[in-house]
């Protein structure tokens, strides 16, 4: 079974539907959702009309609950003809035709009257205090989110060519990557992708290694469809370099994205879904050949990027949310028709078609939410709104999005018919509105870092993925899943977290790192031997001779390897 299949697979735990956790909440059996949507639609003009109407309707409907089933939207024959109002009909009947030339239409007369009225109104003196002041949120900037502490050393552990150790494909403890110190490169950020690694330097340069699967590692000297176990520089074309200095990276399963200081977003590599490569748009083909601009700063300034397995989430300076890529699991948050999303709604350089409406209904009134932070990982997206609340969409098969799975859809025949995907933004009550969280990551579970340095976790807890140390095995029906956030105990203030499939890592303000979960390839960096128990129930400190005299300032964990940035004491 491939890693991607494991992320969405839920068959390894067979438990009753009505499990009860320590909080007394019923916890659902998390079955794999079907990847198919409500059914294929015929292509053509009818579908285009249907989609446009559907998108328009989406912006005016409340989205505060889980979509129970992928809706089968009936074809619409168009809007009924609008009857003229009494005043308009009267105005049209009063029109007198001119003596010569074509007859004047009633609408022209009405427009003339309206324009005349508007002009006279504009010339009237304005009454003081008539206009209500409009509140405008301050613009966001990339330096609120971009890494700023420069490191001295890059280390890696785990398995594969993405480690960046020439001739060595396995290391159970963090080992320094020689090239950065040999060439005097100062690392600023490291991101671990599914089959690759990327490091951003203080000069805005990007170094990569790993498997070059359809443009995943477009570094110098790497053959097409080849691979490299040594970090090499990515050389960008002149038109890409004009977009500004790179200040932030994000990596998915086999793609990478970069944010520039001018607000442009660049991406390269390939996207996948359950049917294979996602390449329905020319831009997605270009990404496989070389880095390309996917959102241009001249059209929209982006200040933060975050990546899931096969989708990218972007936050612009005005607090608008944009999503890009595959939406099969609902992670784009823009449509419940995940199988028939037109290509222009997956890719658009202006960003106009990538916008996610954050419109909700409360007490009969609609209101819009401005986003102030975004998070993405696995097959989901989470948004922190200016109203203090958190909103989520995407795969929710273990209640990891902070939204309880509706148990009412378990049929009398015992079949689990619950919809485990949230297609449109919905409030995630489990996060509450009292705390500010600065990072959220994970796949089937999520690890959550608060601004106060406290760490929480939620979702699937088999293999003690939440770090609570209370799951005892497959017969444990009480602790295998949590749909409310649980605090993980640490002795010091935590400043960073990273999580992927059943694995997590956290590091403290004093430069110490901790790891927990299920160590499959040595990615936890704890030096576990083949005969050792691979399940690490609670956070354990990471140590290495290559870390002596250094403090950890950043880390990124993936399915098979982990990257670490350290600063000399």
Swiss-Prot record:
Pfam families: WD40_RLD (PF25390). Residues 108-124 have a biased composition (Polar residues). RCC1 repeats lie at residues 263-318, 388-452, 511-568. Residues 1-130 are annotated as: Disordered. Its main location: nucleus. Keywords: Cell cycle, Cell division, Guanine-nucleotide releasing factor, Mitosis, Nucleus, Repeat. It is found in: Nucleus. It comes from the Eukaryota. Residues 85-96 have a biased composition (Low complexity). One of its GO terms (molecular function) is guanyl-nucleotide exchange factor activity. SUPFAM superfamilies: RCC1/BLIP-II. Residues 1-10 have a biased composition (Basic and acidic residues). Coiled coil: none annotated. Residues 73-82 have a biased composition (Basic residues). One of its GO terms (biological process) is regulation of mitotic spindle assembly. GO terms for cellular component: cytoplasm; nucleus. Key component of the Ran GTPase system, which comprises ran-1, ran-2 and ran-3 and is essential in nucleocytoplasmic transport. Promotes the exchange of Ran-bound GDP by GTP and regulates the onset of chromosome condensation in the S phase. Binds to the chromatin. RCC1 (ran-3)/RAN (ran-1) complex (together with other proteins) acts as a component of a signal transmission pathway that detects unreplicated DNA. Loss of ran-3 causes low levels of chromosomes to misalign on the metaphase plate and segregate incorrectly in early embryonic cell divisions. This is Regulator of chromosome condensation. It comes from Caenorhabditis elegans. The lineage of its organism: Eukaryota, Metazoa, Ecdysozoa, Nematoda, Chromadorea.
């Amino acid at each position: 079974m491939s890693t991607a299949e494991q992320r969405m697979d839920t068959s390894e735990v067979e438990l009753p539907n009505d499990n009860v956790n320590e909080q007394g909440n019923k916890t659902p059996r998390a079955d794999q959702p079907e990847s198919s949507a409500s059914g294929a639609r015929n292509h053509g003009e009818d579908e285009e009309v249907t989609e446009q109407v559907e998108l328009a309707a989406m912006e005016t409907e409340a989205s505060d609950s889980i979509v129970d089933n992928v809706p089968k939207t009936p074809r619409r024959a168009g809007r009924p003809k609008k009857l003229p109002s009494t005043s308009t009909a009267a105005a049209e009947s009063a029109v007198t035709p001119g003596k010569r030339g074509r007859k004047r239409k009633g609408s022209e007369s009405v427009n003339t009257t309206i324009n005349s009225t508007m002009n006279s109104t504009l010339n009237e003196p304005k009454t003081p205090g008539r206009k209500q002041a409009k509140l405008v949120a301050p613009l966001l900037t990339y330096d609120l989110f971009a890494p700023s502490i420069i490191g001295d050393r890059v280390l890696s552990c785990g398995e594969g060519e993405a480690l960046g150790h020439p001739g060595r494909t396995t290391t159970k403890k963090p080992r320094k990557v020689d090239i950065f110190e040999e060439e005097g490169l100062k690392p600023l950020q490291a991101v671990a992708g599914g089959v690759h690694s990327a490091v951003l330097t203080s000069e805005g340069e990007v170094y990569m290694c790993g498997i070059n699967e359809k443009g995943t590692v477009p570094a110098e000297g790497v053959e097409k469809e080849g691979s490299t176990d040594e970090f090499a520089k990515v050389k960008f074309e002149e038109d890409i370099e004009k977009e500004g200095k790179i200040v932030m990276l994000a990596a998915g399963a086999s793609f990478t994205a970069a944010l520039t200081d001018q607000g442009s977003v660049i991406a390269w590599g390939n996207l996948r879904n359950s049917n294979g490569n996602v390449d329905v748009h020319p831009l997605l083909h270009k990404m496989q050949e070389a880095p390309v601009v996917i959102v241009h700063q001249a059209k929209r300034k982006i200040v933060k990027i975050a990546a899931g397995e096969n989708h990218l989430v972007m936050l612009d300076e005005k607090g608008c949310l944009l999503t890009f890529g595959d939406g099969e699991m609902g992670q784009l948050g823009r449509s419940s028709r995940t199988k028939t999303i037109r290509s222009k709604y997956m890719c658009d350089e202006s960003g106009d078609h990538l916008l996610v409406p954050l419109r909700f209904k409360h007490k009969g009134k609609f209101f819009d939410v401005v986003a102030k932070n975004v998070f993405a990982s696995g097959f989901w997206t989470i948004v922190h709104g200016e109203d203090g609340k958190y909103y989520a969409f995407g795969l929710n098969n273990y209640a990891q999005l902070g939204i309880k799975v509706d148990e009412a859809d378990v049929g009398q025949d015992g079949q689990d018919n619950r919809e485990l995907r949230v297609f449109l933004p919905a409030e995630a009550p489990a996060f509450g509105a009292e705390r500010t969280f600065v990072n959220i990551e994970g796949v089937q579970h999520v690890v959550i870092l608060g601004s106060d340095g406290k760490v929480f976790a939620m979702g699937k807890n088999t293999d003690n993925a939440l770090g609570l140390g209370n799951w005892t095995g497959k017969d444990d029906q009480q602790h295998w899943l949590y749909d409310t956030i649980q605090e993980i105990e640490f002795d010091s203030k935590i400043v960073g977290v990273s999580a992927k499939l059943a694995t997590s890592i956290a590091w403290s303000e004093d430069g110490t790192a901790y790891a927990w979960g299920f160590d499959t390839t040595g990615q936890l960096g704890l030096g576990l031997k083949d005969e050792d128990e691979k399940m690490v129930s609670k956070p354990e400190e990471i140590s290495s001779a290559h870390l002596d005299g250094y403090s950890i300032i950043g880390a990124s964990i993936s399915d098979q390897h982990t990257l670490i940035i350290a600063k000399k004491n």
